[in-house]
Swiss-Prot record:
Keyword ATP-binding: no
EC numbers, comma separated: 1.14.-.-
Protein's recorded name: tRNA uridine(34) hydroxylase
tRNA processing among keywords: yes
Any one GO MF annotation of this record: oxidoreductase activity, acting on paired donors, with incorporation or reduction of molecular oxygen
Gene3D superfamilies linked: 3.30.70.100, Rhodanese-like domain (3.40.250.10)
Catalytic reactions on record: uridine(34) in tRNA + AH2 + O2 = 5-hydroxyuridine(34) in tRNA + A + H2O
Matching SMART domains: RHOD (SM00450)
Rhodanese domain residues: 123-217
BP GO terms, sorted: tRNA modification
Gene name of this polypeptide: trhO
Length: 326
């Protein structure tokens, strides 16, 4: 068995005093040597963490003992290496960001469909199957005949619905995502918009891959995950994809052979999207990483710090552009 257990978990529940849970939860995770990130908001908890089997079991038991956090939905997978670098508990407005006020999966949500019943549902010609994940996730794997909304963030999903779906025309809609949480909100949103028969895959793609045999599966490709594994195959093992340290998108070995691929600096997906400022920053970051390697030093810590700082600056620049665009 692999050394590390990866646990994706979430629960929508009213947590009016969620801020008070941050430090006790962080302390518990650190004491159990668990890494990863958990998000807390007034609407619940969400995140993915990794550690030893005993550590994950203890964390789940600790959460189960907290008011409102019993019976958390979780999925387990395994990895030979620790897929996270740090331990974080963040306070958020939403545990999964759709950006629409008043959407509450605790009040109204679509019909849950077990993995064993999913194939029958999506094989119905009257069912419109929609992948609610981001475009770069869809690109490396999805269900057969699924519609790709081509969204770059989950915030764009409501606009996709408004522009492309009609309750009178689309009588039956089935949706899926990685672990199930995005579909909690997407189905709740569709119900609020007047759609009647709305379904979603219980436990998400990860639960489907766990329970459905490959020879019976309608899943094609690999499943993107938000950690250092990048993707997992049908056996929930680390997949064939790597990640561009500039844009964070999944890349193949073929991508690495491209003239546009420069380790740590660019890839075919982002070569035309990087500003000169970003490119210079990535070049310097990679130089520092290689310098540490040449000295025989452990470069992981400094590399991670550089990556995190680069991500932070990218977010700032992106928000500034969005503000300027109106």
């Amino acid at each position: 068995m692999s050394q590390f257990v990866v646990c994706a978990l979430y629960k929508f529940v009213s947590l009016p005093a969620f801020e008070a849970l941050q430090q006790p939860l962080l302390k518990e995770m650190e004491s159990l040597e668990i890494k990863g990130t958990l998000l807390l908001a007034s609407e619940g908890i969400n995140g993915t963490v990794a550690g030893s089997q005993a550590g994950i079991d203890s964390l789940l038991a600790w959460l189960d003992a907290q008011p409102g956090l019993d019976n958390i939905v979780y999925k387990l997978s395994f990895d030979d290496e620790m897929p996270f670098y740090r331990t974080k508990v963040k306070l958020k407005k939403e545990i999964v960001t759709m950006g629409v006020e008043g959407i509450d999966p605790r009040k109204v949500v679509g019909t849950y469909v077990k993995p064993k019943d999913w194939n029958k549902l999506i094989s119905d010609p009257e069912v419109l199957l929609i992948d609610t994940r981001n475009d770069y996730e869809v690109n490396i794997g999805t269900f057969k005949n699924a519609v790709d909304p081509k969204t770059q963030t989950f915030r764009e999903f409501p606009d996709y619905v408004k522009q492309n779906l009609d309750p009178k025309q689309h009588k039956k809609v089935a949706m899926f995502c990685t672990g199930g949480i995005r579909c909690e909100k997407s189905t709740a949103y569709l119900k609020e918009q007047g759609f009647d028969e709305v379904y979603h895959l219980e436990g998400g793609v990860l639960k489907y891959l766990e329970e459905v045999k490959p020879e019976e599966s309608l899943w094609e490709g690999e499943c993107f995950v938000f950690d250092n594994r990048v993707s997992v195959n049908h056996q929930l093992e680390k997949g064939q994809y790597d990640q561009c340290n500039a844009c964070r998108l999944p890349i193949t070995e073929e991508d690495k052979q491209s003239e546009h691929y420069v380790q740590g600096v660019s890839c075919p997906h982002c070569i035309d999207k990087l500003s000169d400022k970003q490119r210079k920053r990535f070049v310097e970051r990679e130089r520092q990483v290689q310098l540490a390697k040449s000295r025989g030093e452990s470069h992981i810590g400094s590399d991670v710090k550089q990556v995190i700082e680069a991500r932070r600056q990218d977010k700032v620049e992106r928000k500034q552009r969005q503000h300027q665009e109106g």
